[in-house]
């Protein structure tokens, strides 16, 4: 009998199921995957290096462009890290608004992931339904910050501006009618025979394996570990809000889908609580060395004009030191580590992207599965190459 050779198959980088610019070299034994080798770096833009040449405020928009489907979560991590170095306390209204928008961002991210994961295995309807709801949330982004995606809204010292009149009421209206659409998708997918055949038992992973690979977020919780930074290391006002941590049992593609569906419902509840408890007051720190003065003040005071000019030309100087802050981003633990040398620019900024750890386990998760399952596995990882390649 002649020697049997495995076949090498290139998957991507132009493949629609690759979720961006993933090049995957698959070693196949017939239809079965023997090895999956992800080639990353096709979207590398040198973000961490670029940040070293910008002031602390100018570095902020780079974070929107990392995981570009959940931008505000990353701004949040960066702002918290800079505030930790500055030892700056922000007003309570700013904290509530930050949490409100971070939870809307979580909904935004999970809607995209669930609908595209369903599309990858052949279900088109959820995409058409859920993108309609995403559009409404992007409109809230636009009304608050002026941009649909790259908001640059959460800034060190507070927020860019207060929300316009009527926005809170419109978010409240949206949150009331939104669960109906989630119920519709739930009905369409959760007990669907074909959906379950494509996702149940695919790339199962245990808690120990998930921790060994550095998983976080829904990927870790789907394996059965109730680890959520909003509960275990509360930041902002999460310790004053009431929510549950949904977990899975088997750590397979189906459980990851269920965890994300449950997280959307928890985020809806958190948004409602933020709206009910929303206090009045300022939205940025009063420290004029960090946050710009109000427009009205600049028309009357020369001091205010000088502060404004200095802030936007030179930027503020951050005390020497280092800080690491992680937030529970929709994809997992998103961390920012900044080393400051006392100047107006970060000496070093290291970004911990959750998707990076998830993608490195792809070989382990895909081994022994069929070629058709690779689309379901990649869809369940929820990877975006902006943050992986940085």
From Swiss-Prot:
Location of the protein in the cell: Cell membrane
A single GO cellular-component term on record: plasma membrane
Reactions the enzyme catalyzes: a quinone + NADH + 5 H(+)(in) = a quinol + NAD(+) + 4 H(+)(out)
One Gene Ontology MF term: NADH:ubiquinone reductase (non-electrogenic) activity
PROSITE patterns in the cross-refs: COMPLEX1_49K (PS00535)
EC number from the UniProt entry: 7.1.1.-
Keyword Iron-sulfur on entry: no
Principal location class: membrane
Record SUPFAM superfamilies: HydB/Nqo4-like
Domain of life: Bacteria
Membrane disposition: Peripheral membrane protein
Keywords tagged on the record: Cell membrane, Membrane, NAD, Quinone, Translocase, Transport, Ubiquinone
Membership in a protein family: Belongs to the complex I 49 kDa subunit family.
Function: NDH-1 shuttles electrons from NADH, via FMN and iron-sulfur (Fe-S) centers, to quinones in the respiratory chain. The immediate electron acceptor for the enzyme in this species is believed to be ubiquinone. Couples the redox reaction to proton translocation (for every two electrons transferred, four hydrogen ions are translocated across the cytoplasmic membrane), and thus conserves the redox energy in a proton gradient.
Subunit structure: NDH-1 is composed of 14 different subunits. Subunits NuoB, C, D, E, F, and G constitute the peripheral sector of the complex.
NCBIfam families for the chain: NuoD, PRK06075.1
Protein name: NADH-quinone oxidoreductase subunit D
Native species: Wolbachia pipientis subsp. Culex pipiens (strain wPip)
Gene name, Swiss-Prot/TrEMBL: nuoD
